[in-house]
């Protein structure tokens, strides 16, 4: 939340495409003076005007929502990205199933989106990125919502994780966190729950990859998450 406090840090990354969770609606950003974020090509979905999923395009890129769109998949946004290198994007701020043990019977919105948007995903190179709110460390035997169930589905579609392709680390053994939970301390509970998946052919073309540092994003109070930045 409070994207207006983070805009300068975000724009300093000079992104072509930015996927931002817990993001205010663009008209609210405009009222707060965030002209760079409110005047660019952008999309937003959510039920709380101050806390949704935003996609912002810069540097000659534009974004348009793919139709048909299924807003009940909270919050999964299918996006056509046009520009110097067009591609499809599934922007993610996954609101995973709850209710304790009953989760074993629920697939969750992100996994369901792979079926709902399969034609879209298959229509061209597709990047799937954002806050997945999941990791192999929480998987339970036979549960449909498992993180690895989603990873395996995407693997069958020729789509893999950029972080794991670059680092060689196994799923569930990530050494670099993306989320500093609760007390936002570098030695507190930390997790790797933000991911960018891309076509395997693109993973071979990664020119630059980074995970934001604690000091730049969390230690100074900007966020409890750090960004993943990729240049293909």
Which residues does each PLM region occupy?
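Metal-dependent phosphoesterases centered on the DNase I-like endonuclease/exonuclease/phosphatase
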Residues: 17, 108-199
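Short, acidic/polar
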Residues: 1-11
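Short catalytic/ligand-binding loop motif for oxyanion handling, primarily in non-cytosolic enzymes
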Residues: 26-29, 52, 97-100, 135-139, ...
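Surface polyanion/phosphate-binding segment centered on an Asp-His-Pro turn
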Residues: 217-232
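Surface-exposed cleft-lining segments at the edges of enzyme active sites
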Residues: 65-67, 93-111, 136-141
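Structured beta-strand-rich core segments of catalytic domains in phosphoester-bond hydrolases
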Residues: 17, 21-97
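Conserved beta strand-loop-helix elements of the APE1-like EEP
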Residues: 48-64, 82, 173-174, 180-205, ...
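Active-site metal-binding loops of divalent metal-dependent hydrolases
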Residues: 1, 23, 94, 132, ...
């Amino acid at each position: 939340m409070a994207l207006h406090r983070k805009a300068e840090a975000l724009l300093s990354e000079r992104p072509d495409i930015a996927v931002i969770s817990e993001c205010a609606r663009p008209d609210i950003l405009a009222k707060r003076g965030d002209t760079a974020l409110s005047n660019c090509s952008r999309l937003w979905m959510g039920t709380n005007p101050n806390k949704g999923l935003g996609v912002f395009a810069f540097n000659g890129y534009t974004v348009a929502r793919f139709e048909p769109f299924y807003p009940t998949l909270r919050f999964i946004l299918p996006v056509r990205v046009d520009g110097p290198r067009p591609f499809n994007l599934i922007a993610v701020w996954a609101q995973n199933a709850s209710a304790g043990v009953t989760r074993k019977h629920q697939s969750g919105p992100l996994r369901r989106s792979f079926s709902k948007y399969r034609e879209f995903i298959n229509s061209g190179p597709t990047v799937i990125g954002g806050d997945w709110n999941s990791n192999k460390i929480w998987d339970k035997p036979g549960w449909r919502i498992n993180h690895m169930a989603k990873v395996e589905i995407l693997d069958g579609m020729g789509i893999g994780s950029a972080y794991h392709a670059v680092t060689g680390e196994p799923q569930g053994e990530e050494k670099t966190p993306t989320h500093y939970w609760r007390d936002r301390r570098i030695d507190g509970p930390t997790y790797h729950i933000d991911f960018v998946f891309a076509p395997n052919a693109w993973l071979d073309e990664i020119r630059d990859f980074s995970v934001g540092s604690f000091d730049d994003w969390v230690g100074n109070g900007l966020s409890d998450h750090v960004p993943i930045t990729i240049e293909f």
